[in-house]
Amino acid sequence: PLTINSMKYQVAIIGGGPAGYTAAEAAGKAGLSVVLFEKQSLGGVCLNEGCIPTKTLLYSAKTYDGARHAAKYAVSVPEVSFDLPKIIARKQKVVRKLVLGVKGKLTAHGVTIVSGEATVTDKNHVECGGETYECENLLLCTGSETFVPAIPGIDKVSYWTHRDALDNKELPASLAIIGGGVIGMEFASFFNSLGVQVTVVEMLDEILGGGMDRELAGMLRAEYAKRGIKFMLSAKVVSVMPDTAEASSLIQVNYETADGPGSVVAERLLMSVGRRPVMKGFGLENLGLERTERGNVFVNGQMQTSVPGVYACGDLTGYSLLAHTAVREAEVAIHSIIGKKDAMSYRAIPGVVYTNPEIAGVGETEESLQKRGVAYRAVKLPMAYSGRFVAENEGVNGVCKLLLGSDDTVLGAHVLGNPASEIITLAGMAIELKLTADGWKKIVFPHPTVGEIFKEAL
């Protein structure tokens, strides 16, 4: 029998990823009583099997790459090698450290953390581990899961998802990646740097479709093609099967293009077609929430669902499957609960792909503006206009592209070149603050920094 928990909480949060733990910390700081339910490990996909572990692996690959090409900077490194099991072990160490950090922060703010699968029975009650918890406000932060489409033959072969690729301690000779989006390209970069023959099969006619500047994405693809990655674009995968050659343990991916059918054979197959919100397994159906056309949970600008006192943040809403979006949504939700005026804005959410070179964008793309018929002008500048970039990127170039509206306000910014991830926030701030080119120019940038490229472009 269920025991009624004497603990009543002002806020109950389902899911301990970036949305959930940010909300818990913010609510705790505001003096609210908070209970957070997490069935696996605090930090969610992002911290345990996404953002952080992939960046850790990519940094090892980038360091190895840098050492191999150190001669460009007049540094001689006689023999360079890497140790994959040690790279994986370091990744696990980094993750453990950060998970403990999240736990420490939550505990410090008085958050009750409950490990286990929670079920929402109604908007004021959550069951977990035979206990019932009562709450005034309910936050759903259940995240997303890897989506593997039902490709004919997929059940006959052994394939990797991003999670398997993160923990794999033996390098395959060859790797086929289905999906040339962010996850696909980051793993393509990692394995290519370590000497694996990589082929990317992408259904669209360009990699990184949806959110990234098409022209810059094409330039990144050209750079990786030079490094040996093969790209099959506008290629719809029709089936996968064990390779038919005798005594072969390889996997064959069959696809169709406008020019006819084709196939690629590789030792390993990585599925990175995308992610979808987690809607099942926690009693969502007991709440009767309004859904969007795409079937996601509908929320307003304060992250409130159609049921008063119930909020949804992060990947579950399906707006933007990014950790930093989830963090901001969580802040907005807690502000709504404590009565602080705030609203979610999606105008300036940066997107980054941590390849080498990095590519990043924020705000509008040329494609999104053209589609809506908005007048704009594009300003493009080679990254070589930044002295710091030239000093640190021998024999490499990149590009910075700014999109300005008819009144000269900054609408979008896109960068190909390191460290795009670190400088894109400058452009995000300009967009969020609705700065014009003139207004942005008045800000003094330290010299020499790569971020000055924006000022040069204006």
Predicted regions and their residues:
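Beta1/beta-strand and adjacent pyrophosphate-binding region of the FAD-binding site
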Residues: 7-19, 171-181
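Glycine-rich dinucleotide-binding loop and its adjacent helix/turn
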Residues: 51, 142-197, 201, 230-231, ...
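FAD-binding beta-loop-beta segment adjacent to the flavin cofactor pocket
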Residues: 146, 295-309, 388-401, 405
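Flexible, glycine-rich terminal cap/loop adjacent to redox cofactors
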Residues: 12-16, 22-40, 45, 52, ...
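A Rossmann-like FAD-binding core segment of flavoenzymes
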Residues: 112-115, 119-127, 195-301, 371, ...
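FAD-site-proximal beta/loop scaffold in flavoenzymes
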Residues: 155-171, 263-338
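Short hydrophobic core segments
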Residues: 12-14, 118, 133-143, 178, ...
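Glycine-rich flavin
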Residues: 8-9, 25-32, 37-173, 199, ...
